[in-house]
Swiss-Prot record:
Gene Ontology biological process terms, A to Z: symbiont-mediated suppression of host ISG15-protein conjugation; symbiont-mediated suppression of host PKR/eIFalpha signaling; symbiont-mediated suppression of host type I interferon-mediated signaling pathway
G1P2-binding: annotated span: 1-103
Gene Ontology molecular function, alphabetical: protein serine/threonine kinase inhibitor activity; RNA binding
Motif, Nuclear localization signal: chain positions: 50-55
Segments for region (RNA-binding and homodimerization): 1-93
Job of this protein: Binds and inhibits the conjugation of the ubiquitin-like G1P2/ISG15 protein to its target proteins. Since G1P2/ISG15 is an early antiviral protein, NS1 may inhibit the host antiviral response. Prevents EIF2AK2/PKR activation, either by binding double strand RNA or by interacting directly with EIF2AK2/PKR. Also binds poly(A) and U6 snRNA.
Subunit structure: Homodimer. Interacts with and inhibits human G1P2 conjugation by UBE1L.
Protein name per the record: Non-structural protein 1
GO CC annotation: host cell cytoplasm; host cell nucleus
Keyword RNA-binding assigned: yes
Compartments where located: Host cytoplasm; Host nucleus
Pfam families for this protein: Flu_B_NS1
InterPro entries, sorted: NS1 (IPR004208), uS15_NS1_RNA-bd_sf (IPR009068)
């Protein structure tokens, strides 16, 4: 089964998160304008309402992780999102967008833009995936939790109990787990804790996630070059479970970095947000 696996590498930064939220806000603005023209059918109206609720929730959660000077309302993000659409549609890489900084690389074969092939600039200048060390950085007194032959419910509880006894700051978590008695995965995670007034500690920021198969081969690497801040726990109900399943089945669909991060976080004191049917495997 492991022979069917491929290495998935993902790079994520705060700029990409803001760009995505702003772009979706621009889409919402377009939906609303279409609705004003009475051009949306019932499924379209339903999608508009669901998108608005989702964005309001995501913006509220995301703003908590931003300095007060950088927090924006939905209306402010709509305006930026519309600007983004104009830049994207007219393929103007020199325009620049808040939270979305394009750059050019010479590529004469690109028919859409003869002089350049543009993309969003890596959040940490000069550092791309190939430049980042494969293993998560070493941390002092890392905690190691071993999970074997354990269902999801018990595994989550053990992780919660073990992790919440650790100190603040960065940590490394190793999860060794058998999957359907076929594949044992080793997952290394770096992150940062926040200590709340009541003494409860929660994982607030995910820095790195590596996953290895039983032969020690890296099968997935989640990298946050600037730190990946969790956006919305509701996105992560079943992501960690599906992450294991994808490794086991050699799934070809790329693993979304943000969803994976939120999924990992949902295992740390966020059990109440997990869907009841996830239960035991």
């Amino acid at each position: 089964m492991a022979d069917n696996m491929t290495t998935t590498q993902i790079e994520v930064g705060p700029g990409a998160t803001n760009a995505t939220i702003n772009f979706e806000a621009g889409i919402l603005e377009c939906y609303e304008r279409l609705s004003w023209q009475r051009a949306l059918d019932y499924p379209g109206q339903d999608r508009l309402n669901r998108l608005k609720r989702k964005l309001e929730s995501r913006i509220k959660t995301h703003n908590k992780s931003e300095p007060e000077s950088k927090r924006m309302s939905l209306e402010e993000r709509k305006a930026i999102g519309v600007k983004m659409m104009k830049v994207l549609l007219f393929m103007n890489p020199s325009a620049g967008i808040e939270g979305f900084e394009p750059y050019c690389m010479k590529n004469p074969s690109n028919s859409n833009c003869p002089n350049c092939n543009w993309a969003d600039y890596p959040p940490t200048p000069g550092k791309c995936l190939d430049d980042i060390e494969e293993e998560p950085e070493n941390v002092d007194d890392p905690t190691e939790i071993v999970l074997r032959d354990m269902n999801n419910k018990d595994a989550r509880q053990k992780i919660k109990e073990e992790v919440n006894t650790q100190k603040e700051g960065k940590f490394r978590l190793t999860i060794k787990r058998d999957i359907r008695n076929v594949l044992s995965l080793r997952v290394l995670v770096n992150g940062t804790f926040l200590k709340h007034p009541n003494g409860y500690k929660t994982l607030s920021t995910l820095h790195r996630l590596n996953a290895y198969d039983q032969s020690g081969r890296l099968v997935a690497k989640l990298v946050a070059t600037d730190d990946l801040t969790v956006e919305d726990e509701e996105d992560g109900h079943r992501i960690l479970n599906s992450l294991f399943e994808r490794f086991n089945e050699g799934h070809s669909k790329p693993i979304r970095a943000a969803e994976t991060a939120v999924g990992v976080l949902s295992q740390f004191g966020q059990e109440h947000r997990l869907s009841p049917e996830e239960g035991d495997n």
